[in-house]
Amino acid sequence: MNTFGRLLRLTSFGESHGPALGGVLDGFPAGFAIDEAAIEEALRRRQGGRSDLTTPRRESDKVHFLSGLYEGRTLGTPIAFVIDNADTRSQDYSQLSDLYRPGHTDFTYQAKYGHRDPRGGGRASARETVVRVVAGALCDQWLRAEGVHISAYLSQVGAVHYDDSHLYEAIHLTEGDKVLLQSRYEQIVPCPDKATAERIAAAVAETRDSRDSIGGVISCRVDGLPAGLGEPLYDKLSSRLASAMMGINAARGFEIGDGFALASEYGSSANDPFVPTEAGAIEQQTNRCGGLLGGISMGAPLTFRTAFKPTSSIGREQMTCRTDGTLTSLSITGRHDPCVALRAVPIVEAMTALTLMDFYLLHRAYSTAERG
């Protein structure tokens, strides 16, 4: 499917080396004032060619809105937009039309459709995520107006780990940690800790120079969510969020809160105790559940991690097959990211925003219906 969401639906179209990519965001409420500069900033964060740690492909990523906006405000009608492709070098892929690239969708797309576009991965290219970032930036603005703040950051690349427990596990952030989170985009490596960012940069550079690629983990924290978002059983916020993250190119793992670590613990240590606040409310003392119980938000920070595999396109020689079954070897040329996780941080934020705004609108629709 090329459409994501229920009440708020994003449909994307286009290929990596086609003339353009685009999207239609349907269900966005009318009358909301759009900040186009914020959209441009989100796109800049995703953009390649800004350093030698990312792909040299540099697109302008200028958004052309075709419908759904008038005088800077949403109309409540479908918001359609396109982003032109200009910096394509399709000749780099001419030798791949009869090969199956290891780790790519060549084999599966051929098996499903009987025809595929090998240029940059076609529809399966991470270039498609530029559409998600535009739509996600619109949703992020709407959520911020509701007091919801999404902060994703790089917490691991290869063997380099950032100890982010003070950001990921805290119920309430200190003012210093809030500033730290806001600083994550001030360097090329979007990690709040500058020392760790430098170590990550060195690891990526070493990998690039060896014509290889490396994986990473992106952590995300959402503050300001009210209790009650999500549906029981088959439409949990956790399951929808997992679908959103695993739908990102190269995503290979997902966990809410402490996730897989809880599998080796006892309930006595895994449970988050409830405690009264000074204001007379109730909150958790810890947040190992990641802010969700039964797939429904409880007013605590929503925390999750997404793991990304190493980029499939590498310069090292790999064994593969031609489409006729002949064994051969392959060294991929062209322009590729040595670590996709570096540019995936704003994509994680975008998909989070799309998911959460959809749940907000559903929650309000149900509440209105119940009031009659």
Language model: regions and residue ranges:
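N-terminal, positively charged regions that mediate nucleic acid binding
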Residues: M1-R57
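Internal helix-turn-beta structural module
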Residues: R9, T311-G372
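A short glycine/serine-rich beta->alpha loop
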Residues: R9-G14, D117-E128, A227-E231, N287-L292, ...
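Glycine-rich anion/phosphate-binding loop at the beta-strand->alpha-helix junction
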Residues: F13-P19, V133, S210-L327
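Alpha-helical support elements that line or immediately flank enzyme active sites
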Residues: P19-G31, A126-A152, D235-S243, A300-L302, ...
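Glycine-rich, N-terminal phosphate-binding loop and its surrounding beta-alpha-beta segment
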Residues: A42-P102, D106
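Short acidic, glycine/tyrosine-flanked loop/strand segments centered on an H-E-D-like triad
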Residues: S97-G122, M319-H336
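Glycine-rich, mobile lid/loop segments that gate access to catalytic sites or pores
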Residues: K112-G230
